[in-house]
């Protein structure tokens, strides 16, 4: 039987950050987020499962695509800096996303680009400026061993 008194831990929302390796002027820390902070979502499979006559053969991929979304406080200049970057060059490069968990390591994404801009509310009831990126996340490192 498991211990019912296992410590649950705590999240720290001000840990969340987006660090842009080659464009540090775009780095985002807690004070620059709007109401929401950030999300990361895998797209597609980390491994293919290829049918055979009598079963299936796994075929691990060396990378997985991810969507990275975060919401900036649009009343701060950093939101305009991200908009300027989108207008100038949609290629961002590598980014590091620090999570809200003190025990979960950061996620490092390669070759990130802008996906799109979600709806921006302009009626004075939301301060969120949405940023959507797509990047490559290395998985299955054992393939290279």
Describe the role of every protein-language-model region.
Residues 73-75, 100, 112, 136:
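Short, loop-centered acidic/histidine patches that primarily coordinate divalent metals
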């Amino acid at each position: 039987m498991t211990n019912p008194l296992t410590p649950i831990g705590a999240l720290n929302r001000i840990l969340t950050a987006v660090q842009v390796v080659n464009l540090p002027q775009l780095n985002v820390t807690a004070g620059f987020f709007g109401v929401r902070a950030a999300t990361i979502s895998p797209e597609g499979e980390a491994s293919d499962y290829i049918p055979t006559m009598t079963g299936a053969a796994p075929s691990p991929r060396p990378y997985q695509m991810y969507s990275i979304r975060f919401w900036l406080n649009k009343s701060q200049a950093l939101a305009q800096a991200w908009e300027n970057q989108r207008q100038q060059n949609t290629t961002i490069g590598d980014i590091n996303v620090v999570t809200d968990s003190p025990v979960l390591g950061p996620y490092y994404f390669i070759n990130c680009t802008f996906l799109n801009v979600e709806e921006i509310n302009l009626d004075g009831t939301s301060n969120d400026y949405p940023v959507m990126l797509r990047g490559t996340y290395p998985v299955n490192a054992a393939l290279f061993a």
